[in-house]
Amino acid sequence: AGKSTASILDATQPTNRVIVTWHDGVKQGRPFRWASTEANLSSAQKSCFNIKPDSATTADCASNTSTDKLGEDRLNYIRGERGKELSSGGTFRNRQSRQGDIVNSNVWYVGAPVSNYAFKGYSKFTLDNKKRLPIIYVGGNDGMLHGFSTVDGSEKIAYIPRGTIPNLTRLTWPSFDDNHRYFVDGSPMTGDVDVSDRSSTKYTPDWRTMLVGTLGGGGKGYFVLDVTKPEADFTESKAASLVVMDQTLHSS
């Protein structure tokens, strides 16, 4: 039998994972890594990671008065670091795997483009991407949408939606397993879209494969990722173009 995506992820160095998120300040995709500045997360988002989680933790980070300075450790825990878990002498929840449980999110497969559109430029788009690396996408209750290679099962991309950030600290809570909550619980789907300006008859088609994901039971929100070229674009340096948008209830 082949290895599971969880076992492959557990054998991966957390620092090598490509994980991106949405920066509320600049309103763009950014690497999900701690920084002393607001380069990757806004100050409000960073404050969410300094919350001590318990049964009273709310999604409004500002209303939580029990805080500490373990934000960087919590973010690294979410990335997969295990050195602060209880079994290692730390205070964070023990995990059986870095990959969280998947409950209601259905797997979505994306290989070569297969739609038979007769629109301008689409046939070239299909030819250009006929050898595209096949990826399966699925949401998890570790706070991420995952993209796994169907070739070897390795994680190629993970996305943390803005709507999950206020509650991510709960994943470090030792009592989380008895107080489970959903995060990225919705099912992703994709479609091929011409994103060019078609107001001119001389426009140049710009076809992309766009993924739409939702939080499902994890909240009211959706996000859009450009998953056209996994091998070229699934890097943290391209987070700004990879994440097209991320909207939650009452967000701007």
Predicted regions and their residues:
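A fold-level detector for beta-propeller and closely related beta-sheet-rich head/sensor domains
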Residues: A1-S252
